[in-house]
Amino acid sequence: MPRIIGIDIPAKKKLKISLTYIYGIGPALSKEIIARLQLNPEARAAELTEEEVGRLNALLQSDYVVEGDLRRRVQSDIKRLITIHAYRGQRHRLSLPVRGQRTKTNSRTRKGKRKTIAGKKK
């Protein structure tokens, strides 16, 4: 298993798929990185040489925000929205959907398990 920026990527999968195991790298960004380094996207990750792994590490650390840095940035953005009392921040704070979805029904993932309330008296 090659280790890239502290993450073990699957050795038996193709390079274009293996890179997507790094948080912040999807299929499109994976293709872009491979093209920039002129690597073979169909080659297996185990076939990478030490020099290629080094180039990959250097590129990811210098030009891209991935893994821990990206997670920290997302969390700090959410904290900032909460502290400035933005609408999106309030939705995050209340654990409700942020992007305008309906909440009368659905949104169980965000709200959590149903809280049973006593029915209306006749």
Swiss-Prot record:
GO terms for molecular function: rRNA binding; structural constituent of ribosome; tRNA binding. Residues 101-122 have a biased composition (Basic residues). InterPro entries: Rbsml_uS13_C (IPR027437), Ribosomal_uS13 (IPR001892), Ribosomal_uS13-like_H2TH (IPR010979), Ribosomal_uS13_bac-type (IPR019980), Ribosomal_uS13_CS (IPR018269). One of its GO terms (cellular component) is small ribosomal subunit. Residues 96-122 are annotated as: Disordered. GO terms for biological process: translation. Keywords: Ribonucleoprotein, Ribosomal protein, RNA-binding, rRNA-binding, tRNA-binding. It holds the Pfam family Ribosomal_S13. SUPFAM superfamilies: S13-like H2TH domain (SSF46946). It comes from the Bacteria. Part of the 30S ribosomal subunit. Forms a loose heterodimer with protein S19. Forms two bridges to the 50S subunit in the 70S ribosome. NCBIfam families: uS13_bact. Located at the top of the head of the 30S subunit, it contacts several helices of the 16S rRNA. In the 70S ribosome it contacts the 23S rRNA (bridge B1a) and protein L5 of the 50S subunit (bridge B1b), connecting the 2 subunits; these bridges are implicated in subunit movement. Contacts the tRNAs in the A and P-sites. Belongs to the universal ribosomal protein uS13 family. This is Small ribosomal subunit protein uS13. It comes from Chlamydia trachomatis serovar L2 (strain ATCC VR-902B / DSM 19102 / 434/Bu).
